[in-house]
Amino acid sequence: MKGSGKDENKRAPMYWSTDADATGMCDGSKDMDEVKMKYGSLKEQENDGNSIYNFVKQTIALRNEYPVIARGKVAFDEGISDDTVCVIRKTCDEGQLTLVFNTSEKAQTVDFRKSALGATEDRKYPLQIAGELLTGTEAAVLDEEQLTIPAYSVVILE
């Protein structure tokens, strides 16, 4: 892992460009190990919609759009979560959201009729897709009470 080990490695500089002499580039600490960043420079990632840079940017935008993600009380849905899918409900004064995480390399289908949390007076199923964090071009599909979520993705339902 980059930034692990000795202290100097934890201060490795960001690769702003592939050009080592570009404005903003620095060498880092003299005692830092030579490292090659896994995801490339910012300049390379900015125009790639599937880059780690854009994934983090989208993650922050969704967190800012839905404060309940950061502030909400968590309820784990044991009824529909398993080894590859995690479903949680976040609740606070700002509202309520359901977050679905697919940690597998294949699309998964979640049946909300099996939810351990169930519907509440103000939380009826089916829900609506409010946001997605995708790692590819395939989108999530909500069909009545079943959600098909692409590999390595997160879906926010409201």
Give the ranges of each region predicted by the language model.
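C-terminal beta-strand-rich structural cap/linker in extracellular carbohydrate-active enzymes
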Residues: A139-E158
